[in-house]
Amino acid sequence: MHAILILGAGPAGAAVALGLRRLGYPVTLISDWRRFPALEGVSVRVLEALRGAGLEQALAQALQPSQRRVAWNGEEHAQNIEYLLDRPAFDRGLRQALREAGVQLIEGRVLGVQSTEAGHRVQVQGQAEQVGEFLVEARGRQAPVLDKGLRQGAGKGLRGPETVSLLNRWQGPVGSAASAVYSLEDGWAWMARRADGQCYWQLTLDVASAGLPGKVQLLEYCRQRRQASAMAREFFADGEEQQLHLHARSSTAILNPQVCGAHWLRVGDAAMAVDPLSGNGIFQSLSSALQAPAVINTLLQRPQNRALAQRFHGQRVEHLFQRFARIGRDFYADEQRWSEQPFWQARRHWPDQQQAHASVDFAALRIERAPVLRDGLVDEADVVVTPDQPLGIWHVQGVELAPLLRRLRSQGAAQALAPLSPEQGRVIRGWLLSQGYRP
């Protein structure tokens, strides 16, 4: 059986590893522990995606429900409950789930990767060299590009406005869990506190216009910015900040120019990383990772369909990136008080002016041949392309849409829907109405 190496044990790498194990592949996953104990706010939708990827066990000791406040464009309101995800606990849970699935885990820092058409050799600090036929890059937005010899064409990578996030963590007094987000003239901030008193505050700024001080002064700069915010002072109750730490990182939106080759694949933030305001990073990572096992299976088992599998992965990664980028753009456009300031001006028009969600138009529906996932492989089928789903929809509730649309256009609704079960008929009618169909 083909030996597969995965670099990175975050949600994307873990989801790919578990999916490959279900397909029977031997998997070796190499990863170092993250150096900063991060906290993330996740929605119910993210939790459902994690459970769908087989990662529910990893959530067991990592979640705290929290009421989220939002102060944006001069208005303040409390949004739905979000869940504060403790990344160290979550990462431990991910590794446990991987071990139980039979994934070989190697802990250590990757020192180098040599890739050829024949395979991949990975040097790991303090460990033996690892060799595999296929490589999955899942080390996040900082993952290095592949050897030049294996790149196929230039690709059209994209970068959003250069953005930096400054995360502060400290120990405060014990209390209730909470989280909040608020806009500023030169950026925006997210803050959270756990019930055990761990506090987090992250400031996101425009690199070109921020005028940040040197590294030594950054911690004091962040403290002053926090003290200047009435919302932050109230949120943290002016509590003492003990064991204060700083972690600075790039949060620029990035689409990698090439995400799939014959013997390698990029997933998660290594494939595309979007602005943190555009949505949750874990959800975006899973969006590209869940399709990866079928893509890899096709590349290894159906060489005649390699181009189709590469097209499938590349198109979907780019589509997800553009959609999330447009959602972020619309959030930025909602803040109108500082629209001419450099931070907001650059982000309210990027990546383009196309709608994040296209208007429905039943007359615009068309049938095309496109790659789909069938029985753990990438195959080709007739799909229905809609204004909001340009890559096409194959089936809904087990009903293939292309044959249904053909029947609908030639026979009318009653005859076209007659072969369906009552439940299928109910769901399909709802879908047709949502696409602008009027009987």
Language-model features, listed with the residues they occupy:
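Beta1/beta-strand and adjacent pyrophosphate-binding region of the FAD-binding site
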Residues: 1-10
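Glycine-rich FAD pyrophosphate-binding loop
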Residues: 9, 21-39
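N-terminal Rossmann-fold NAD(P) dinucleotide-binding loop
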Residues: 13
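N-terminal FAD cofactor-binding segment of flavoenzymes
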Residues: 33-69
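Short beta-strand to alpha-helix junction loop
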Residues: 77-97, 210-214
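FAD/FMN-dependent oxidoreductases across multiple families
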Residues: 84, 213-329, 336
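Predominantly flavin-linked oxidoreductase catalytic cores and closely associated redox partners
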Residues: 99-235
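Acidic, low-complexity/disordered tracts enriched in E/D and polar residues
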Residues: 345-407, 426, 430-439
